[in-house]
Regions:
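Short, conserved catalytic or adaptor-binding loops enriched in Gly and charged residues
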Residues: 2-8
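Acetyl-CoA-dependent GNAT
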Residues: 9-84, 88, 93-94, 106-107, ...
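Conserved GNAT acetyl-CoA-binding A-motif
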Residues: 106, 112-125
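Active-site acidic-Proline motif in GNAT/NAT acetyltransferases
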Residues: 93-95, 99, 127
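C-terminal "cap" of GNAT-fold acetyltransferases
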Residues: 18-19, 26, 119-122, 126-140, ...
Length: 183
């Protein structure tokens, strides 16, 4: 399987092993920001897991964004056998905010989830993350009843997605062969 890269000038978004040093940097920065922004702090040990083994194929994946070679953001997927996928660990470095990177990461996660057969994406977030809540709403996520017992969550969202094949095509549309277009 060829991994998709979501690249534009100066910013590269790629599937990355969560044990990679750049991935570790992003995840540490994500946890530190949550600890600073949440009223009662943040302890990753109390949160619903997204362990390294859950963030590598086929269980899931971690996307890491770099800007000019430096860590700029991350986002993860946890895949479930019933067609659900969870978005986890969405973070954009302070110096990369305002560039649309959060939306790019979210769109890339949606693309990756659809390519892996997901039919619905879910996520939860904390009320202190107003910019994330606005992003999710503007991207078509709708607020739903709590679907887990995440102690740090105040908002739960979901969005249906159409599964695609690994190349980004609708799996329900048969491919056209080159000979079919000849007359």
């Amino acid at each position: 399987m060829t991994e998709r890269r979501h690249t534009t000038p100066a910013i590269d978004v790629a599937v990355t092993d969560p044990r990679d040093p750049v991935a570790r940097h992003c995840l540490r920065a994500y946890f530190a920001e949550l600890a600073a922004r949440f009223a009662g702090g943040f302890d990753p040990g109390r949160s619903i897991s997204a362990d390294d083994d859950e963030l590598v194929p086929p269980a899931g994946l971690l996307l890491v964004a770099t800007r000019h070679g430096e860590p700029a953001g991350c986002g993860a997927l946890k895949l479930h056998a019933d067609g659900r996928a969870e978005i986890k660990r969405m973070w954009v470095a302070p110096g990369a905010r305002g560039l649309g990177l959060g939306r790019r990461l979210l769109t890339a996660l949606e693309t990756e989830a659809a390519a892996r057969g997901a039919t619905v994406l879910r996520l939860e977030t904390n009320r202190a993350l107003g910019e994330a809540i606005r992003l999710y709403r503007s991207a078509g996520y709708r607020e739903v009843a709590a679907f887990n017992d995440e102690p740090y969550a105040h908002h739960w969202f979901e969005k249906p997605v159409e599964p695609t094949d690994r190349e980004g095509n609708d799996p329900w549309t048969p491919p056209t062969s080159p000979s079919a277009s000849r007359t």
